C-alpha cells in the first residue's frame, strides 16, 4: 500500500507539472506501468519504488540511462532483451578471433594454390571449395547465423586475395575467368641481363656527355673566331681571303701521290692515296689546334682573345718537306669547296693573321702543329643517335 500510494502521488504530481509546462515530456504512465510490473521482481517493494522515483525526478538524459538499466519484463522487456543479445553477439564476432585460425595471408596462399592447380578457374569455384574446406560442420552446435557469417567472411577474403594476386601479375582475369600466370622469379640470367643493360646505359651516357662537351667547345671556338674576325675588320687589317666553314682537312705524307677527282656539281670528291696513310680533320679540329676552344668568348667590353694569343693558320707548301728540327712538323694538304671567291666578313672564315713589322719573312712563321691522330673524319655538328 505504501508503494502504491507513493506512485499515485507521484503520478498526480507529474500530471500537474505537465499541464503547467506543455513542452515537458511526461513519463507518468510509463513509470506507473513499470512500477506495477516490477513489484514482483527482485528486491523489496519499497526499494523498487525508491528506484522508480529517482528515475522520474532526474533529467531526461539520466532518465534514459537509468530506464535502460532497469530489469524490465513483459513484451517491451523481451524486445529490448533480444536487441541486447543481438548487439552482444555482433560484438563478440567483431572482437573475437577467427575460429578457423586463417588470416588473409593464409587465404592468399590457399587461393594461389587453387588457381595454380587448376590453371583456369572462376571466383565462385575457388570460393565454394574454400568454404567447404574451412566452414564449420553442422554437428558442432554452430548456429545458422554463425555459419552464414563465416561463409561470407571466407568469400570476402577470397575476393581480396584474388585482387592482390592480380595486382602482382600472378594471375589474370578475363571477365569471370581467372588464369594462372606464374610467380615472379629472378634467375642468374636476369641478373646478367640487368648488368648488361646498366653497362649499355652508362656507355650511352658517357657518349652523350662527350658529344655535349664537344658541342660546347665548338660553340666557344666559333664565338672566338667571330670576335677575332670582327676585330681584324674593325682595325682595318682585313685580309684578302680565307677558308670558309665548314671544310675538311686532308693530311698525309709530304711526298705522297694523291689523286683527287671532284664532280661537276662540286658535291662529290674522290681521293686515292695509293696505300699511303692519311688523316681527315674537320674545321672543329682546326679551331682546337688554333687554341680558339681553350678560352670562353670575351664580352664586348672586355679584351679580345686575338689580343692575347696570335692565332695563325698557314697551310704548308706541299713542295717543301718537313722540317728537320727536334720536333717534326706535319705537312697538310688542304682541299675545300667554295661557292664564292670573295667572302664577306659576316661569314665564318679562318683568316690568316696579317704579317706585322716584327715578322721579317714568312719562313720564320711556324706552321700549325697537330698531334698524330688515326684516320677518322669528324664532321662538324654531327647528329647523335
Curated annotation (Swiss-Prot):
What biological process terms from GO does the record include?
DNA endoreduplication; G1/S transition of mitotic cell cycle; regulation of cell cycle; regulation of DNA-templated transcription
Q: Where is this motif: DEF box?
A: 150-184
Does the entry feature the keyword Cytoplasm, yes or no?
Answer: yes
This entry's Gene Ontology molecular function terms read:
DNA binding; protein heterodimerization activity
Q: Which InterPro entries match?
A: E2F-DP_heterodim, E2F_WHTH_DNA-bd_dom, TF_DP_C_sf, Transc_factor_DP_C, Transcrpt_fac_DP, WH-like_DNA-bd_sf, WH_DNA-bd_sf
Alphabetical keyword list: Cell cycle, Coiled coil, Cytoplasm, DNA-binding, Nucleus, Phosphoprotein, Repressor, Transcription, Transcription regulation
Name the Pfam families for this protein: DP, E2F_TDP
Post-translational modification (record): Phosphorylated.
Q: Does the keyword Cell inner membrane apply?
A: no
Q: Where is the composition biased (Low complexity)?
A: 32-53, 336-349
The coiled-coil segments of this chain are 185-234
Note the superkingdom of the native organism: Eukaryota
Give the residue ranges for region: Disordered.
Answer: 1-53, 71-102, 296-385
Expressed, tissue-wise, as follows: Ubiquitous.
General function of this protein: Involved in the regulation of the G1/S transition. Increases the DNA binding activity of E2F proteins after heterodimerization. The complex DPB/E2FC restricts cell division and lateral root initiation and may function as a negative regulator of E2F-regulated genes. The interaction with SKP2A is controlled by auxin.
Similarity comment = Belongs to the E2F/DP family.
The subunit structure is: Heterodimer with non-phosphorylated E2FC. No interaction with phosphorylated E2FC. Interacts preferentially with E2FC, but also with E2FA and E2FB. Interacts with SKP2A. Targeted for proteasomal degradation by the SCF(SKP2A) E3 ubiquitin ligase complex.
Q: Domain notes, please?
A: The DIM domain (182-263) is required for heterodimerization.
Write the protein's name: Transcription factor-like protein DPB
Organism of derivation: Arabidopsis thaliana (Mouse-ear cress)
Its taxonomic placement starts with: Eukaryota, Viridiplantae, Streptophyta, Embryophyta, Tracheophyta
Amino acid at each position: 500500500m505504501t508503494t502504491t500510494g507513493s506512485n499515485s502521488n507521484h503520478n498526480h504530481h507529474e500530471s500537474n507539472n505537465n499541464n503547467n509546462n506543455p513542452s515537458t515530456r511526461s513519463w507518468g504512465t510509463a513509470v506507473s506501468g513499470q512500477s506495477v510490473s516490477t513489484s514482483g521482481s527482485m528486491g523489496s517493494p519499497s526499494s523498487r519504488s525508491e528506484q522508480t522515483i529517482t528515475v522520474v525526478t532526474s533529467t531526461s538524459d539520466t532518465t534514459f540511462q537509468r530506464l535502460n538499466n532497469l530489469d524490465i519484463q513483459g513484451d517491451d522487456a523481451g524486445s529490448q532483451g533480444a536487441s541486447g543479445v543481438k548487439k552482444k553477439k555482433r560484438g563478440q564476432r567483431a572482437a573475437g578471433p577467427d575460429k578457423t585460425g586463417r588470416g588473409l595471408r593464409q587465404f592468399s596462399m590457399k587461393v594461389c594454390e587453387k588457381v595454380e592447380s587448376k590453371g583456369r578457374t572462376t571466383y565462385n569455384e575457388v570460393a565454394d571449395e574454400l568454404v567447404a574446406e574451412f566452414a564449420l560442420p553442422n554437428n558442432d552446435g554452430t548456429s545458422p547465423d554463425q555459419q552464414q557469417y563465416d561463409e561470407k567472411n571466407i568469400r570476402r577474403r577470397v575476393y581480396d586475395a584474388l585482387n592482390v594476386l592480380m595486382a602482382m601479375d600472378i594471375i589474370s582475369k578475363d571477365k569471370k575467368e581467372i588464369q594462372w600466370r606464374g610467380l615472379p622469379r629472378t634467375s642468374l640470367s636476369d641478373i646478367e641481363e640487368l648488368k648488361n643493360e646498366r653497362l649499355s646505359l652508362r656507355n650511352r651516357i658517357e657518349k652523350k656527355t662527350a658529344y655535349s662537351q664537344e658541342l660546347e667547345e665548338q660553340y666557344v671556338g666559333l664565338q672566338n673566331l667571330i670576335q677575332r674576325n670582327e676585330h681584324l675588320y674593325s682595325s682595318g687589317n682585313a685580309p684578302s681571303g680565307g677558308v670558309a666553314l665548314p671544310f675538311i682537312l686532308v693530311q698525309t705524307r709530304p711526298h705522297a701521290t694523291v689523286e683527287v677527282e671532284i664532280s661537276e656539281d662540286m658535291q662529290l670528291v674522290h681521293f686515292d692515296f695509293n696505300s699511303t696513310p692519311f688523316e681527315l680533320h674537320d674545321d672543329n679540329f682546326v679551331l682546337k689546334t688554333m687554341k680558339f676552344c681553350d678560352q670562353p668568348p670575351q664580352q664586348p667590353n672586355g679584351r679580345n682573345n686575338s689580343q692575347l694569343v696570335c692565332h695563325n693558320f698557314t697551310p704548308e707548301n706541299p713542295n717543301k718537306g718537313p722540317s728537320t728540327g727536334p720536333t717534326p712538323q706535319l705537312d697538310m694538304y688542304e682541299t675545300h669547296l667554295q661557292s664564292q671567291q670573295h667572302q664577306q666578313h659576316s661569314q665564318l672564315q679562318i683568316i690568316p693573321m696579317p704579317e706585322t713589322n716584327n715578322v721579317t719573312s714568312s719562313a720564320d712563321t711556324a706552321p700549325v702543329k697537330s698531334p698524330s691522330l688515326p684516320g677518322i673524319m669528324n664532321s662538324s655538328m654531327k647528329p647523335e643517335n
